[in-house]
Swiss-Prot record:
Family: Belongs to the NAD-dependent glycerol-3-phosphate dehydrogenase family.
Protein name: Glycerol-3-phosphate dehydrogenase [NAD(P)+]
Cellular component per GO, a single term: cytosol
Protein function: Catalyzes the reduction of the glycolytic intermediate dihydroxyacetone phosphate (DHAP) to sn-glycerol 3-phosphate (G3P), the key precursor for phospholipid synthesis.
Organism placement in taxonomy: Bacteria, Pseudomonadati, Pseudomonadota, Gammaproteobacteria, Oceanospirillales
Source organism: Hahella chejuensis (strain KCTC 2396)
Amino acid sequence: MEKSQKVTVLGGGSFGTALANIAAGNGYPTVLWMRDQERAAEMSKTGENARYLPGVKLNEKLICTSDMQEAVANSDLVLVSVPSKSFGDVVRDAKQYAKPGQFWLSTTKGIDEKGFKLMSDILREELTEQEIGVISGPNLAKEIGQESLAATVVASNSEPVRTLVQDVLSCRYFRVYANVDMYGVELGGALKNIYAIIAGLASALELGENTKAMLITRSLAEMSRFAVFMGANPMTFLGLAGVGDLVVTCSSPLSRNYRVGFALGKGEKLEDTVAALGEVAEGVNTTRLVRDKSRELGVEMPLVEGLYKIIYEHFPIKEVVSQLMQREQNSDVEFVLPRSEAN
């Protein structure tokens, strides 16, 4: 049965396509917007996003378009699913067609370098008459497209936003959990990209399972430490948007950031690796932004510092690993034993 609320997804990448397909499959009139008119026409004709989500059949009722007015003007729920570097531009292009009372959510896991803004900050600045939120979690788009069992988190201060997103996106293979800590959910999605690169490096160097476990756990500690300084709830990082997203992106070759790290560990050039991906690996830019912000705040983030040295200062990987292993040993769980009291 067709539902009354209309859904729009801005961004024809892999994750945006997967979410739009779910919404259409749940009976919501859904429009998937992308800049490229030819690609929109091709997807409408073939019923497939051959570039970003090949092999996944699109719902026959899903409308693909490059017309922003058609996509936004009559929508009730707008999901923005574009890379962070173009997020602000897309929202500013779209807001002229926005109407009061619409729900706008970001699915983008990145940080805007202009003032260290998260995507919800941009939505809040640009859309003053709309309710906002974010979606984040352990969501590899290819697996979702193939209908593998998965879950995500919708975070918003608005209960109607959370409820509608759960209704629109929940299905037999995809669950949607709710949270009010929008900042924490969003930070988790952005920060884990850094550590996925590190995990890929470790895998390429064949450092072992103990090493991987250590890296993931210390990554979670580092993320939580930074999040507290930024005003997020550390408990959020124990959920799907924190440890859940961290584990999947640090373990799967389907993760773009993991693949970047793996290639670096094999001695490939960063520029060649990023170009070969065909999609954005947010962790490369996020590493620089978080390293600078952590220094500004006085937050210790040794893994971020180490990766920054490898990517931007071209330190030998083995030298950075050696430096990290020789650091002063501190507390394991800092919210139990503060760093200042550790041996």
